[in-house]
């Protein structure tokens, strides 16, 4: 099974783009060359701010969704403190208990 990664790319205007891939370097190069996500085209210099393995595609999609819901401040904390990402990942792997 090919592992999936979650990554954050910082744009020249300091915004953070979140994505998932099985090959971070390849995907980053696609974004750099303008062949990646339209959201990053024409955004100036791009920097890979964060990447981490998340497991399978299903978990990667859930992690991407959760990170995209975070505020800019929370995303910056995630980039600065990888422990925060471990907590996020752990919460996605734990089944939620629904109460009626």
UniProtKB/Swiss-Prot annotation:
InterPro entries: GIY-YIG_endonuc, GIY-YIG_endonuc_sf, UPF0213_domain, UPF0213_GIY-YIG_endonuc. Pfam families: GIY-YIG. Disulfide bonds: none annotated. Residues 2-77 form the GIY-YIG domain. Belongs to the UPF0213 family. This is UPF0213 protein YhbQ. It comes from Escherichia coli O139:H28 (strain E24377A / ETEC).
